[in-house]
Amino acid sequence: MMTFHPSPPQLTLIKSMLFIAALLPFGRLALFTLTDQLGANPIEFITRNTGDWTLYFLCMTLAITPLRRLSQWNWLIRLRRMLGLFAFFYACLHFTTFLWFDHFFDVNEMLKDVVKRPFITVGFSAFVLLIPLAITSTNGMVKRLGGKRWQWLHRLVYVIAALGILHYWWMKAGKHDFEQPIIFGTIVAVLLLVRVFWAWQKRSKNNALAGTSDCRTG
């Protein structure tokens, strides 16, 4: 595959364009709200839209490492933090919609709903787990936690994605409409299996090298 190594100004431009593109769904939602184009059920439209974009950005975040390894475009890793933070941004909008329109900012009533309805329990759990990932996304937090601990913490993103998809599946179950949850689930499963395969491949290689070294020293 053709290698592409952007210069610092080019990378800044790419990041700026990605930032603007990532805000477009929010801009569209704001425009539809202001022009009364949210349809017959505005609350449902906003809730579904922000939930969908949370999952889109989670999938894009998870796709960065496989894309980087397959394309050898190491600079792609510089985009992962932004994509992850936009996943958190749309998750915050999704949660705010639930807290505002469903419970009018009554936290006690919201928590009762979280306990009572399993699909909300799952979605709320995913949102809560996203918070420490967003907080520790800075370079300073990477240094403070240490590389290994930071990596272990951020592997929670797969748990979060799985919980988000389960939340979506459960929500769609009432209408027997599983097409989109299946698509999201397949994407996340493939991305996870690719990483598992690479980890197994690396371990096998290390074991083979260790065996060769033992034979030589023996």
UniProtKB/Swiss-Prot annotation:
The keyword Electron transport applies. It comes from the Bacteria. InterPro entries: Fe3_Rdtase_TM_dom, MsrQ-like. HAMAP family: MsrQ (MF_01207). The chain crosses the membrane at residues 12-32, 82-102, 118-138, 150-170, 180-200. The keyword Transmembrane applies. GO terms for cellular component: plasma membrane. GO terms for biological process: protein repair. One of its GO terms (molecular function) is metal ion binding. Heterodimer of a catalytic subunit (MsrP) and a heme-binding subunit (MsrQ). Its cofactor is FMN; heme b. Binds 1 FMN per subunit. Binds 1 heme b (iron(II)-protoporphyrin IX) group per subunit. PANTHER family: PROTEIN-METHIONINE-SULFOXIDE REDUCTASE HEME-BINDING SUBUNIT MSRQ. Part of the MsrPQ system that repairs oxidized periplasmic proteins containing methionine sulfoxide residues (Met-O), using respiratory chain electrons. Thus protects these proteins from oxidative-stress damage caused by reactive species of oxygen and chlorine generated by the host defense mechanisms. MsrPQ is essential for the maintenance of envelope integrity under bleach stress, rescuing a wide series of structurally unrelated periplasmic proteins from methionine oxidation. Belongs to the MsrQ family. Keywords: Cell inner membrane, Cell membrane, Electron transport, Flavoprotein, FMN, Heme, Iron, Membrane, Metal-binding, Transmembrane, Transmembrane helix, Transport. This is Protein-methionine-sulfoxide reductase heme-binding subunit MsrQ. It is found in: Cell inner membrane. It is a multi-pass membrane protein.
